[in-house]
């Protein structure tokens, strides 16, 4: 892992590990570029990223997230999604490659979404397992299913319709391609719901 150097802003010029990389661009306006091109890992691997997002200087006006992730852990997805969604500086998301599962959900965490040519999002239900005694297993499955539904609803609607959300919960995958006719309508509906005109 590279050792970052400090500068007058208190941010690092470069910061990276196996899960992400950050670069700081200095013009008159500071922009932060973040690249996530691996699976979404467990949240402890993003502690420096979280710290960076919490300590952005006042003259930083944009965070650019470049995303090409093939999925990963929900335990890492939730804090990552929240870090971008509620960042004090607006986050613009650029999908640069295929994004599956947790990667697709992370694409909806910013203030805007741009899908580059030949890219795709694939949404599907979560997978996992439980172990324990009989009633504990039952409770874990019931509460886990309820929690997953709530997380999915909060993250993917209204980009995905309620019918598509129900499909996800019943293991029907949903694919969104960069050139499909309704993509811009989905983006407006999700990121600018007040501006979406109902017909």
What does each model-found stretch correspond to?
Residues 7-9, 29, 196-199:
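Intrinsic disorder/low-complexity segments enriched in polar/small residues
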Residues 17, 21-131, 135:
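Cleft-lining beta-strand/loop regions that shape enzyme active-site pockets
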Residues 1-21:
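Intrinsically disordered, low-complexity segments enriched in small/flexible residues
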């Amino acid at each position: 892992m590279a050792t970052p150097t400090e500068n007058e802003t208190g941010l690092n010029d470069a910061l990276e590990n196996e899960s992400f990389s950050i670069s700081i661009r200095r013009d008159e306006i500071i922009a932060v570029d973040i690249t996530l091109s691996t699976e979404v890992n467990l949240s402890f691997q993003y502690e420096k990223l979280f710290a960076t997002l919490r300590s952005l200087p006042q003259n930083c006006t944009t965070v650019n997230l470049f995303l090409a992730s093939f999925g990963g852990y929900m335990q890492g997805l939730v804090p990552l999604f929240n870090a971008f969604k509620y960042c004090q500086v607006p986050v613009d998301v650029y999908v640069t490659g295929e994004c599956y599962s947790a990667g697709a959900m992370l694409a909806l965490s910013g203030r805007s979404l741009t899908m580059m040519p030949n890219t795709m999002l694939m949404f599907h239900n979560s997978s996992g397992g439980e172990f324990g005694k009989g009633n504990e297993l039952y409770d874990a499955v019931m509460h886990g299913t309820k929690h997953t539904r709530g997380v999915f609803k909060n993250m993917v609607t209204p980009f995905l319709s309620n019918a598509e959300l129900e499909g996800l919960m019943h293991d029907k995958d949903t694919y969104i391609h960069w050139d499909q006719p309704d993509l811009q309508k989905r983006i407006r509906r999700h990121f600018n719901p007040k501006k979406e005109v109902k017909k």
